[in-house]
Amino acid sequence: MFLSTLFLVSLATCVICGNPSSPPVVDTAHGKVLGKHVNVEGFSQPVAVFLGIPFAKPPLGSLRFAPPQPAEPWSSVKNATTYPPMCSQDAARGQAVNDLITNRKEKIHLEFSEDCLYLNIYTPADFSKNSRLPVMVWIHGGGLKLGGASSFDGRALSAYENVVVVAIQYRLSIWGFFSTGDEHSRGNWGHLDQVAALHWVQDNIANFGGDPGSVTIFGESAGGYSVSILILSPLSKNLFHRAISESGVAFIPGMFTKDVRPITEQIAVTAGCKTTTSAVIVHCMRQKTEEELLEIMHKLNLYKLSLQGDTKNSDQFVTSVLDGVVLPKDPKEILAEKNFNTVPYIVGINKQECGWLLPTMTGFLPADVKLDKKKAIALLEQFASMTGIPEDIIPVAVEKYTKGSDDPDQIREGVLDAMGDVAFGVPSVIVSRGHRDTGAPTYMYEYQYYPSFSSPQRPKNVVGDHADDVYSVFGAPILREGASEEEINLSKMVMKFWANFARNGNPNGKGLPHWPKYDQKEGYLHIGGTTQQAQRLKEEEVTFWTQSLAKKQPQPYHNEL
């Protein structure tokens, strides 16, 4: 132990910033960290990588269901060259999702732990404190219950675009969002972890070559949703300066609730805890082991949909809540009042958000299930019970999305398109309009491309599935084998758009197709094999759902949608 510590200290004393022959060692507010250099094909200069840097204390014991606390300082040099454990989750699903979406060439075996508040950093090897490079902070997706930072290798984005990439982790599921709706467990712990990571970036990223005054937060699915929540939250004011939401915004149905009682009591009862008071529940839940909480998740099956059973009693997410801290009001009210972080904002979706990945991973529509109209209505009724959509709208929606056809393939495609619009397309347009109306620069895109390394089980007609854009954003065609020149060039273009936006709040630049602002003309960019301007993304679908819902309730748009 003494010799290994001596070795790390000797590295710290001999390292010279900008000398890639020496492993990089950087000072943080809590102690020194040792990283490593990794190569990117086509670049002579490597990327400096730091893995598993703690940004908060392990959220264990009394810190379970509590705000994150600053990390404890360390005296020796901390080895930051191995992937940190991902936050507690279903291990089999977590590994499966990682293997499907990772941009890495090699596969890694993941570890999972309640001790998981770590971040990874990728920065050009010649960095110095004076580099002042744009910082891009990635928030992973996974429905607030799966995923982690290490599925995403930031080396290509960092090398090609000369930016600092930071991938953060946050508590998930019960650990991240359990709430009693009062001071005993307010909830939104995962969002508070995200805020804590952004504070860490402000305090430390300059030493890694980053500019704390030029921070872009970006994320996909639940990560894009989290970005949107952070835009609306007063806690994150001045912690970032631009934002990108990919396939996820604050209005995703079923991801936010004002009433935590049903799911909280269900969790407590399943855990064998008395529900007499909030204090009793929280005390009992803190005594449970990590394995016991995982077993509760499995018993409750918290978000799997199926065609079987009573469609009116589908299971719930453990979601973001109205806590009075992260979210002082309903997100819809905050957006309407225009009182939030009005930073430049990119919002995007994929062409077929529910094409294959989400139905497969959640089990709500296996590939071998044939649908008729009756089954389609039953499935969408179950989906509606999760999202707050009145059931009597469903038959009309089925007719619209299937174009009146009785063909099972067209019914299936229509049902999945309806789900994609309700969950992603329509909310993304509504949030973009609200952001635009503050005067903040706003951009929208729709991505449509079939990645060459998609799962062999994925149908060839699903082009632009959930998370497909992430492959381009993180340079997967460059890091993985088998991509065509067209696919590699698409990824380079997308990385350039994202990095330009991180640099100056505008994705446009020399040699790129023009990306119009999302103004009253509602211009957006169609990104894919052919990248070109278009107008009024999902206009017909937004009109259908908003008008249908307006007839059923006094509010212009449902609280959850």
UniProtKB/Swiss-Prot annotation:
Which Pfam families does this UniProt record tie to the protein? Answer: COesterase (PF00135)
* Gene Ontology CC terms: cytosol; endoplasmic reticulum; lipid droplet
Q: Which cysteine-cysteine pairs are annotated as disulfide bonds in the entry?
A: C87-C116, C273-C284
Q: Does the keyword Endoplasmic reticulum apply?
A: yes
A GO molecular-function descriptor? all-trans-retinyl-palmitate hydrolase, all-trans-retinol forming activity
Q: What class of enzyme is it?
A: hydrolase
Q: What is its main location?
A: other
Inducing factors? Induced by fasting and repressed by refeeding.
UniProt cross-references to Gene3D superfamilies, sorted A to Z: alpha/beta hydrolase
Q: What is its EC number?
A: 3.1.1.1
N-terminal signal peptide: 1-17
What are the protein's UniProt keywords?
Answer: Cytoplasm, Disulfide bond, Endoplasmic reticulum, Hydrolase, Lipid droplet, Microsome, Signal
Q: In which tissues is it expressed?
A: Expressed in liver, white and brown adipose tissue, kidney, intestine, adrenal, heart and ovary. Not detected in muscle, lung, testis, brain and spleen.
Where is the motif named Prevents secretion from ER mapped on this chain?
558-561
Q: Which residues form the active site?
A: S221, E353, H466
> Catalyzes what?
a carboxylic ester + H2O = an alcohol + a carboxylate + H(+); all-trans-retinyl hexadecanoate + H2O = all-trans-retinol + hexadecanoate + H(+)
Q: Where in the cell is it found?
A: Lipid droplet; Cytoplasm, Cytosol; Endoplasmic reticulum; Microsome
Q: Which domain of life is it from?
A: Eukaryota
Q: InterPro entries, alphabetically?
A: AB_hydrolase_fold, CarbesteraseB, Carboxylesterase_B_AS, Carboxylesterase_B_CS, Type-B_Carboxylest/Lipase
User: Which terms does the UniProt entry file under GO BP?
Assistant: short-chain fatty acid catabolic process
**Role, per record:** Involved in the detoxification of xenobiotics and in the activation of ester and amide prodrugs. Hydrolyzes retinyl esters. Hydrolyzes p-nitrophenyl butyrate (PNPB), triacylglycerol and monoacylglycerol. Shows higher activity against PNPB, a short-chain fatty acid ester, than against triolein, a long-chain fatty acid ester. Shows no detectable activity against diacylglycerol, cholesterol ester or phospholipids. May play a role in adipocyte lipolysis.
This protein's name: Carboxylesterase 1F
What does UniProt list as this organism's lineage? Eukaryota, Metazoa, Chordata, Craniata, Vertebrata
Gene that encodes it: Ces1f
